[in-house]
């Protein structure tokens, strides 16, 4: 457990409750920090060097596969395994949606048309004034309305 001197040194002008008066509304006792201040030890100055690969080699002409990446993994000269009709369909109809702006316009138009359809097919008797009275009116004292 930390001693009182350590707490006073770390927290300058800390208030201690409950030392004077009642324990509920005790007077605060202010403690001055000790003359001994906490100073970090001197830091060493030096250049920061990032390590990449083995022995800080950034580009290796002898090993271009690891330097530039394995491009053979992704490119293939083999024919497409998909049906040509399916490929043509997706190239034709999905091409406009490759850009963000066109996709956003499509979503806005779709959302607007959905909102229009829902509002047109909803019933208009939502407000009480449109629905009219729901219960039979109560008769007055002489049996009249």
From Swiss-Prot:
Keywords: Chloroplast, Membrane, Photosynthesis, Photosystem I, Plastid, Thylakoid, Transit peptide, Transmembrane, Transmembrane helix. It is a single-pass membrane protein. GO terms for cellular component: chloroplast thylakoid membrane; photosystem I reaction center. One of its GO terms (biological process) is photosynthesis. Gene3D superfamilies: 1.20.5.220. It is found in: Plastid, Chloroplast thylakoid membrane. InterPro entries: PSI_PsaH. The chain crosses the membrane at residues 102-122. Coiled coil: none annotated. Residues 1-50 form a transit peptide. It comes from the Eukaryota. Possible role could be the docking of the LHC I antenna complex to the core complex. Belongs to the psaH family. This is Photosystem I reaction center subunit VI, chloroplastic.
């Amino acid at each position: 457990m930390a001693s009182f001197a350590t707490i006073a040194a770390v927290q300058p002008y800390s208030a201690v409750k409950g030392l004077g008066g009642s324990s509920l509304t005790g007077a605060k006792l202010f403690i001055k920090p000790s003359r001994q201040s906490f100073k970090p030890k001197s830091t060493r100055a030096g250049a920061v060097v990032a390590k990449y690969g083995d022995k800080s080699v950034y580009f290796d002409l002898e090993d271009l596969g690891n330097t530039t990446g394995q491009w053979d993994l992704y490119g293939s000269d083999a024919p497409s395994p998909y049906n040509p009709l399916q490929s043509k369909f997706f190239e034709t109809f999905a091409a406009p949606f490759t850009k963000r702006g066109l996709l956003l316009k499509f979503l806005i138009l779709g959302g607007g048309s959905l909102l229009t359809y829902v509002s047109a097919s909803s019933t208009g008797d939502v407000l009480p004034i449109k629905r009219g009275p729901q219960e039979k009116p109560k008769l007055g004292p002489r049996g009249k309305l």
